[in-house]
Amino acid sequence: SNSYLLLTGPAPRIIYSKFSNDRADIYAIRTDIEEDAQGKRCVRKYPDTPAAAEHVENIFRYCEALGKRYEGSGLLINRCELERDDAGGVCAVLEYLEGKTLEEMLDRCLEEGDQEGFDRLFLEYLDKIRFHETFPVSDYDLIFGNILVDSEGRWNLIDYEWTFDE
């Protein structure tokens, strides 16, 4: 048998959704990419369980802390705002940025046999992540795929969910 779903009304705002609910309840979240009527996108992170609300709130808190740590390093932290609904629910709202991940750029260097380009990017990465390394906050997931290089060459940390005080 076949099944069909027909949606009527305005187009849904959510264009992508990922559930990260294979984690402990205190870290279970849903990440949505939304697009408004003008085509502007944003990323929203919601707690998937009541226990994960603090984890979502920490994304906002660590945006500020990482911004202080990496200020002047050339590594920008994707802006985050915290929203609350009338029922007290929380949501972290991040910019939707476009560009290429550092992972894609490094892979391309390897595919093209560009060892010099690879080394240059890797050393720049090391310089940026070591900046103020004694600062009492660390992102344990500061991987190549979480750094987006935009069309103007700016390095942006787009996901810093796994940041903790040291």
Language-model-derived ranges and their functions:
Residues 41-42, 90, 153-155:
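Hydrophobic residues embedded in beta-strands of well-ordered beta-sheets
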